[in-house]
A protein has these predicted regions:
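Short coil/turn connectors at secondary-structure junctions
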Residues: 7-10, 35-38, 58-61, 85-90
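Glycine-rich phosphate/diphosphate-binding loop of Rossmann-like nucleotide-binding domains
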Residues: 1-20
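Glycine-rich phosphate-binding loop
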Residues: 28-70
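Short, solvent-exposed amphipathic alpha-helical segments in soluble enzyme
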Residues: 1-6, 30, 57-59, 108-109
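Structural motif
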Residues: 19-30
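C-terminal binding/interaction regions
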Residues: 12, 73-137
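Short glycine/serine/threonine-rich phosphate/pyrophosphate-binding segments
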Residues: 22-23, 46-53, 72-75, 100-103
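Short, ordered loop/turn segments at secondary-structure junctions
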Residues: 16-18, 45-46, 67-70, 95-98
Length: 137
């Protein structure tokens, strides 16, 4: 959310489960599409079927973040998120916090394909990262 806010991209956060609240998840997906959602981001640990379930209910881009909890520290979530059947893709990022940050940047990049102002904000952010890195040396 912080990354999206930095790009002035609106977002909706909802806690739902592919296993425990499947009907509510489907309804949320349908409602947010009607409201103009362009990209979905899901984070789940362990069996981690949330992002795949979202992808099953929309043709919009879905970004999956494997949660870093559980006895395998997110490795099980990574495999569950990345191993999708042909034709139902989920763009999977790194496990945990780093993945969450990159999911925000990736969502912004997807949206920027049709938004020159957003594309400039992303380019400016990259330049700022470069400046900070070079300054710290």
């Amino acid at each position: 959310k912080e990354v999206l806010d930095g790009y002035e991209i609106g977002s909706v956060i909802k806690v739902l489960s592919a296993h425990r609240t499947p009907e509510a998840l489907k309804e949320f997906i349908e409602t947010t599409i009607k409201d103009g959602t362009k990209v979905f981001v899901g984070i789940a640990g362990l069996a981690a079927h949330l992002s795949g379930n979202i992808a099953a209910h929309t043709t919009l881009p879905v970004i999956g973040i494997p949660g870093d909890g559980g006895p395998l520290n997110g490795l099980d979530a990574l495999f569950s998120t990345v191993q999708m059947p042909r034709g139902v893709p989920v763009a999977t990022v790194a496990i945990g916090k780093a993945g969450a940050v990159n999911a925000g940047h990736l969502a912004a990049q997807m949206l920027a394909t049709g938004d020159q102002d957003l594309a400039k904000k992303i380019a400016d952010q990259r330049e700022e990262q470069k400046r900070i890195l070079l300054e710290d040396q």
